[in-house]
């Protein structure tokens, strides 16, 4: 089907690098296909990239602040008590949804890409517009029903949970929790705002991030979930990750041109600062390790010490290019981060801070190109042991094989096709 020129409104969670870059890459692909695309975000530290990509934008108020984002991250990582409320008042939710509705009324889109901008889960159903979300495969109900969802290591607070309770039991627990009313306590103000607009409440995460069409920027070989087993309304595209249009700093080239093992480290925008500091301190202690680190937004690079001839840290780097230069990568397991490394064919040591990140790393473990260290087990000896093992030729060989398969896909092109066809098919 050849679409007429469609207008798409793009929303994303502008503080979350993974969600934001997936939205941005998809919007760029939408424009390249001849469609119209415009961004509407409630603030976010990454929003400057929208104009740099040549896409129209309108910032909406009230904004979701950085301080609110930090609390949301702690909720997602189980760093705070389960049931901790989202740090957004009923009034703010209503005002954010009203701002969405005003923007949508002015733009008159044919469809809305909602990302993880949660006010869209109020405004878009109220406006009765077609809504597309793009989420990790762990948020597909089938993934949970098939008991593939492992307990987050951050919930395993003691020896019994970590070492004694069998994995299959923990997966059954997570199934019951996630498909029940697990988010009810966290979503009180959100549901009060939905009630204000005449919408029913949402009590779990899978329903919270579900669109009329939900795209999984993933592949069965990575997630472990067959395409034919997906819940109705969920479809795979293929990996989507940022290829930042940034130059490689000369410092990176200088560090990686030294003799020794080249290591790239990044814990994305959701890793713990203290964990990143421990990793870098451990790596610096080994003279033949050459280390490049992208800190993103979790800390100031200066907190890791001065740059030297074998260590360089900065906030952002073109990760797809730096990964290609590295012998191994130490990562947090965010979907885009993992997929970038798979595209580059670089063996991975992964440390997941959320269940989704654990699942992403485990996908590469199954393919023989990664080792995962549970967050509770991160220590200098464990890190060094993993580096020794991941440097074996079998991991390199497997990583190259995965690279070939990933590069044969085009997740952006497929997502754009799915989105446009969804809107056109629902017009008929």
Where are these regions (language model features)?
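Solvent-exposed alpha-helices and their adjacent loops that cap or buttress functional pockets
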Residues: 105, 206-208, 256, 322-323
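Donor-nucleotide binding loops and adjacent catalytic segments primarily
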Residues: 218-328
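Short boundary motifs at domain starts and secondary-structure transition points
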Residues: 1-2, 203-207, 253-256
């Amino acid at each position: 089907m050849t679409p007429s020129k469609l207008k798409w409104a793009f929303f994303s969670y502008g503080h979350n690098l993974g969600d934001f870059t997936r939205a941005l890459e998809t919007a760029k692909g939408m424009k390249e296909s001849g469609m119209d695309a415009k961004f509407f975000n409630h603030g976010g530290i990454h929003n400057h990239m929208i104009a740099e990509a040549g896409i129209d934008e309108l910032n909406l108020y009230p904004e979701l602040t950085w301080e609110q984002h930090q609390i949301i991250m702690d909720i997602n990582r189980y760093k705070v008590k389960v049931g901790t409320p989202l740090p957004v008042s009923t009034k703010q939710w209503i005002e954010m949804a009203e701002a969405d509705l005003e923007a949508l009324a002015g733009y008159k889109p044919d469809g809305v890409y909602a990302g993880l901008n949660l006010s869209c889960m109020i405004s878009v159903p109220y406006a009765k517009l077609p809504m597309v979300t793009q989420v990790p495969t762990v948020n597909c109900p089938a993934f949970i029903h098939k008991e593939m969802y492992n307990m987050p290591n951050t919930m395993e607070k003691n020896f019994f949970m970590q070492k004694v309770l069998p994995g299959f039991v923990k997966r059954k627990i997570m199934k019951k929790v996630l498909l029940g009313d697990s988010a009810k306590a966290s979503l009180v103000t959100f549901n009060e705002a939905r009630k204000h607009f005449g919408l029913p409440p949402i009590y779990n995460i899978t329903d919270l991030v579900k669109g009329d069409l939900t795209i999984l920027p993933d592949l069965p070989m990575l997630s472990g979930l067959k395409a034919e087993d997906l819940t109705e309304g969920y479809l795979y595209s293929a990996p989507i990750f940022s290829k930042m249009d940034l130059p490689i700093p000369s410092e990176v080239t200088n560090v990686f041109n030294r003799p020794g093992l080249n290591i790239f480290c990044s814990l994305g925008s959701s890793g713990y600062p203290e964990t990143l500091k421990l990793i870098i301190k451990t790596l610096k202690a080994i003279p033949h390790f050459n280390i490049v680190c992208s800190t993103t937004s979790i800390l100031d690079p200066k907190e890791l010490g001065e740059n030297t001839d074998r260590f360089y840290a900065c906030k952002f780097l073109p990760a797809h290019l730096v990964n290609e230069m590295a012998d191994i990568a130490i990562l947090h397991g965010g979907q885009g981060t993992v997929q970038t490394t798979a595209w580059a064919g670089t063996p991975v040591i992964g440390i997941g801070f959320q269940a989704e990140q654990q699942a992403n790393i485990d996908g590469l473990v199954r393919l023989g190109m990664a080792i995962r260290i549970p967050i509770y087990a991160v220590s200098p000896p464990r890190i060094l042991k993993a580096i020794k093992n991941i440097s074996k030729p079998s991991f390199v060989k497997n990583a190259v094989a995965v690279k070939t398969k990933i590069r044969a896909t085009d997740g952006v092109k497929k997502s754009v096709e799915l989105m446009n066809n969804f809107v056109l098919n629902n017009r008929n």
